[in-house]
Amino acid sequence: MRRFELIAPCHFGMESVLKREITDLGYDITEVADGRVTFFGDEEALCRANIFLRTAERILIKIGNFHAETFEELFQGTKSLPWEDYIPKDGKFWVAKAASVKSKLFSPSDIQSIMKKAMVDRLKSQYEISWFPEDGASFPVRVFLMKDEVTVGLDSTGESLHKRGYRKLTAKAPIAENLAASLIMLTPWNGGRILVDPFCGSGTFPIEAAMMAANMAPGRNRSFTAEEWPHIVGKKIWYDTCDEAEEMVDLSVETDIQGYDIDEDMVKIARENARMAGVDKLIHFQRRGVEDLHHPKKYGFIITNPPYGERLQDKSQMPALYRTIGERFRELDSWSMYLITAYEQAEKDIGRKADKNRKIYNGMMKTYYYQFLGPKPPKRREI
C-alpha cells in the first residue's frame, strides 16, 4: 500500500480533540499546528479518516512543502512537486483555496492562478502533451502559507466533513456538525448520563451525541472526492471501510438524550434531521422554553448553543435570557453545563464564573466555550 502524509484541518482551538481522534484510529501524529493535525497513513487510513473522524473539516494528501517569498519561487516550488503521481491526463485540477498568514505572498487569487499555471507546466512536460481536456475526475488542491512556508495538499474529501448528509433543514444560525462533535468530546459525557440541549434548534448537538452513543461513523452516508481516484485508492478499500462502519453501529444502546426548543417548527425540523441521521429513536425532542428547564435525574449534562444577540433587535433580550439560564442551572445542582456563545456578558448574567473557558473561532466569529462543572457522580459500589 502507498503511504501518505495526511493533513486534517479543524476548527481553531479543537486540535487536541482531533489529535485524540486520530490517535484512537491508530495513526501516528507528525505535527499539530493551529487549525490542523498531520499524520501518516496508507490508502485505508485515508478512507477511515474521511468516514470516521467527527471533528476534522477534510482530509488532504500532502503533496509537498517549500519556501516562497516571491511569485517566481511559488511557481518553481509548485512545478517541482510530483503532480503526475496523483493527477491523470484527463484530471480536472484547480487550486480550490489558498490561505496566507504572516507571509509576503498574501493574495489568494494570485496564489491560485500562479500555482495552476505551474501545475499545468509540470504536467505538460511529464505527459508530453500541450492541452488537457480536464473532463475526468476532480482533483482540488488546497494551499497554506505560514511565514512564507508553503504547504500543498490534495483534497480527498470534497464538501467539508461537517456535511454528514442528515441536515436537510437548518436553524437560522446552526452550529457546524464537526464543531458540535468537538465540543461534546471536550466534556466527560459518554452516553451513560443524561444530556440536554435546551436551545436545540435543528438538533445538531443531540444528533451528534446520539451518533457517538450508537458508535455511528459520521461519514457513512456521504460521498468523497477520492472515490473517483481508483489509481490512488482502490474501490475495495472504500467498500471494506464502509462495511466496517456499518458493523460498528449499535442502535440498541441505552442513552438519554433530549433536545428542547421554544419554536415548534424547529422541533419538527430537529426530529426530521434525527430521522435522516438514523438516530431518531435515541433522542427525545420537545417544545419547551428554557424557563421550564428542569429534570428529576441527577448528574446530567447541558450542552448548548444559546442565542447571543447577533441581531441588533435581540441584544436587549440577552441579559434576561442568560439570567434565566443561570437560575435554571442552579436548580440542577448536580449537573454540569457547557455552552458556546459570542455573548461576552454570559458569566455575569448567569451569575457564576465558568470553571473553564476556551476561546473558539466559529468561522470568523470569536466565541467562548464556557464550562460550568458539577460534582462527579458517586462511584458504584462493587458487589
Label each residue range with its predicted role.
Residues E44-I51, E159-H162, P378-R380:
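Short, charged/polar, Gly/Pro-enriched secondary-structure boundary elements
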Residues V141-T157, Y370:
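C-terminal edge-of-domain segments
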